[in-house]
Amino acid sequence: MKKPIIEFKNVSKVFEDNNTVVLKDINFELEEGKFYTLLGSSGSGKSTILNIIAGLLDATDGDIFLDGVRINDIPTNKRDVHTVFQSYALFPHMNVFENVAFPLRLRKVDKKEIQERVTEVLKMVQLEGFERRSIRKLSGGQRQRVAIARAIINQPRVVLLDEPLSALDLKLRTDMQYELRELQQRLGITFVFVTHDQEEALAMSDWIFVMNDGEIVQSGTPVDIYDEPINHFVATFIGESNILPGKMIEDYLVEFNGKRFEAVDGGMRPNESVEVVIRPEDLRITLPEEGKLQVKVDTQLFRGVHYEIIAYDELGNEWMIHSTRKAIVGEEIGLHFEPEDIHIMRLNETEEEFDARIEEYVEVEEQEAGLINAIEEERDEENNL
């Protein structure tokens, strides 16, 4: 990894008035020029991290670094970051141009440069021609663009975004996701985005930190987070999941629902109790006799791009299926899935334990592969004599 632009070392936060612990020993590094998302439900601590970076809150313990410099005692206005708030925090008595130009005027930039830079950023956020428009006459999406333009006008090292899309309607929110991501990539500025919306995080991020109860429970790329959740919380918080109790018989073989299935996971103890995760979109409806499992359809909803089907197996386990094929309530169907569709989670495994287990397992696999290759080469040499 390159030199981090932001680093948290053992950062904790306790609100002393009610002794509430909101952050617990947070450690992470953010690389320059990437789009990071802090994802979690209300009260998870994600906005607290953002406010500590901005200097709006002090950490109780730990160190915060910006570009290698400890900034715990540096005031907000001296930090090379800018925050876009959920409320946008625009000045209603100023027009669009004046709002965007405000940070430059605070720094006493000359009028010609202000004109050039404001014109440039308004073009970036697709607000050309809105310079003299009153803030009160703008739509929610337009106000959002003004707030972003003001955030980037000083070319900060980091832009912090605290749930800026939450007040927008679905269509506009989706459009702004594309615009934010494209803008970040064009500028090359580090974006730190806070949201409770899983789809936003998956769509825009280079890297996601999933938070719960003041802790980072998992971090990774959107694909890693979605395909390889490390625990029950992440599996249920990120998308829909079918989660069942199971037993890892041995590497690549798991038992659940009273049957054994091939899998792609390994590195666990023989007969270890685990949780089995299969995503609804990975289940394919078949004839009952052709399925690996048989279930009875209970309810069905049309979601536009697919049907969401709820079914139950003979053991009473609930199954959610996303299918373009319409089912009939009350009918018995088969469910087919591939070994790679089965994800295995150890009970109560932390991210550190997960990473260590995978690293150790890969090393053992490589050693075994090397030994097999050596034996085969030795046999080939003997056969050639």
Swiss-Prot record:
Alphabetized UniProt keyword annotations: ATP-binding, Cell membrane, Membrane, Nucleotide-binding, Translocase, Transport
GO molecular function: ABC-type polyamine transporter activity; ATP binding; ATP hydrolysis activity
Catalytic reaction(s) noted: ATP + H2O + polyamine-[polyamine-binding protein]Side 1 = ADP + phosphate + polyamineSide 2 + [polyamine-binding protein]Side 1
Subcellular location: Cell membrane
GO CC annotations, alphabetized: ATP-binding cassette (ABC) transporter complex
Enzyme Commission number(s) from the entry: 7.6.2.11
Residues at which ATP binds: G40, S41, S42, G43, S44, G45, K46, S47
Lipid bilayer topology: Peripheral membrane protein
Highest taxon, organism lineage: Bacteria
SMART domains (UniProt xref): AAA
InterPro entries from the UniProt entry: AAA+_ATPase (IPR003593), ABC_SmlMolc_Importer (IPR050093), ABC_transporter-like_ATP-bd (IPR003439), ABC_transporter-like_CS (IPR017871), Mo/tungstate-bd_C_term_dom (IPR008995), P-loop_NTPase (IPR027417), Transp-assoc_OB_typ2 (IPR013611)
ABC transporter domain location: 6-238
Subunit structure, as described in the record: The complex is composed of two ATP-binding proteins (PotA), two transmembrane proteins (PotB and PotC) and a solute-binding protein (PotD).
Family as reported in the entry's similarity comment: Belongs to the ABC transporter superfamily. Spermidine/putrescine importer (TC 3.A.1.11.1) family.
Role description: Part of the ABC transporter complex PotABCD involved in spermidine/putrescine import. Responsible for energy coupling to the transport system.
Name by which UniProt lists this protein: Spermidine/putrescine import ATP-binding protein PotA
Gene this protein is translated from: potA
